[in-house]
Amino acid sequence: NKGRTDEKARLALGDIVRVPPLKTAQRTGDVKTAPVIREAELPVLFEDEHLLVVNKPSGLAAHGGSGVAFGLIERLRASRPAAPFLELAHRLDRDTSGALIVCKTRKALVRLHEMQREGKVEKHYRLLVQGDWVNDRQHVKAPLARYVLPSGERRVKVDEVEGLSAHTIFTLIERFGDVSFLDAELKTGRTHQIRVHALSTGHPLVGDDKYGDYAFNDDVKKGSLGVRFARLFLHAMRLQFIHPVTGSPVTITAPLPAECEALLAALRARGRVKDAK
């Protein structure tokens, strides 16, 4: 009625209400500003009209936020401006490498989210841990809870009271005495689950700057294991699931990065390898 009012005003029959125009964020904004990503930086492991599975390198965040302007998904959209729909089906930590699913249709995304909640997506990781892991196969069922450091950094810990249920199956591949090479199968998908579960057994991951042994990792960076190694040794190696749209079985394998293979080769060359039974 040609005047301003507040939220307490009651409307009467015949009142004229004008709402000022609102500025809304446009999805095209990240396409214009995010740098494109070359295929050599992000190898494609599988692609059809519904799914895109890529081999994410260590150091690339899956998405923007927390001090990261653009992550993998924003850069992927910038690289494929004609794609109407690109969304992450799950996430990997910034320092974790390996297979990551991107959905190209909403139908695939919704179904894949359901499948993950139902435990119908099998996920295997390769990791190198500090110390001599002796069990051929070990189930770790320890509830996990998030907390915040005084610096504002978010972390995860085992918390029997307030934690959410979490289950990881570790399988020994090779023992090298001071470090051990393992497979980890995720039965749940909590933040930092493998890293914190491994730590809870007394075996932090090699190169883990959040939960690892800082002095040990510093020595590893300098070549104490035979070659210089300066990243988290955690790689999403294999995904196995039924295609969310076609119903066909899908198995994706992401080869270990060259730097991880080089470290394993150096460890094997020391002649201290003990294969798991």
Segments and roles (model prediction):
Residues N1-S151, L164, F233, T253-D275:
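RNA pseudouridine synthases
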Residues R4, G177, L182-E185:
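Short histidine-centered loop motifs in beta-beta connectors
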Residues K23, L42, V161-L164, K187, ...:
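Pseudouridine synthases involved in rRNA/tRNA modification
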Residues V44, V129, I169-L172, L205:
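Conserved hydrophobic positions within beta-strands
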Residues Q130, I173, E185, I242-P244:
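A generic structural motif
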